[in-house]
A protein has these predicted regions:
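N-terminal helix-turn-helix DNA-binding core of bacterial DNA-binding proteins
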Residues: 20-62, 147-151
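Charged, amphipathic alpha-helical coiled-coil/dimerization segments
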Residues: 71-129
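Short, hydrophobic-biased segments on the C-terminal half of alpha helices
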Residues: 52, 70-71
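C-terminal regulatory/oligomerization modules of transcriptional regulators
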Residues: 1, 124-157
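N-terminal leader segment of winged-helix/HTH proteins
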Residues: 1-29, 157
């Protein structure tokens, strides 16, 4: 019974915090969080490019319409599609300089929202404890990047 109660709370908190973060981004005039997520993964990739299936697999948020998201990023000049030189049927999505700039600008609003809705409610020891509990459920906070990387627009996971 306690596991069910924990599950329900986990899902409710995740939904509420994501909704609040989305609203903060919207108020700041930015596109949805999925755009940030995709741009971040592209910026982290070698040469700034990934196959669409790799992008979908690496995104933090579930993205059921990755092809539509990629289309929007391309239309806005934040990414480009290019053919694989070896396999002409293969496609890559590559982040543009404009995409890198937007991802960094969005991080300012995103990180402020994380602080507002999570950081301000947890002490550092509480956050470490929460990461430990989530690790037991299969979410490894130990793979997180250092805080300095987060300040540069590349958040820890």
């Amino acid at each position: 019974m306690e596991a069910t109660a924990a599950w329900i709370r986990l899902m409710r908190v995740q939904t509420r915090v994501l909704d609040a973060v989305e609203q903060e981004l919207k108020k700041a005039g930015f596109p949805p969080l999925a755009w940030y997520d995709a741009l971040l993964e592209l910026s982290r990739a070698p040469s700034g490019e990934l196959r669409p299936v790799e992008l979908e697999r690496q995104m933090l948020l579930p993205q059921y319409s990755t092809s539509r998201l990629i289309e929007r990023l391309v239309d806005e000049g934040l990414a480009v599609r290019r053919e694989c030189k070896i396999d002409k049927r293969g496609l890559f999505v590559e982040i543009t300089e404009a995409g890198r700039e937007l991802q960094k600008k969005m991080w300012n609003a995103y990180s402020a929202a994380i602080e507002k809705y999570v950081g301000s409610k947890l002490s550092d020891p509480d956050a470490v404890k929460l990461c430990g509990l989530l690790d037991r459920l299969g979410c490894s906070c130990s793979e997180a990047k250092p805080a300095a990387a987060a300040r540069d627009g590349v958040p820890a996971r």
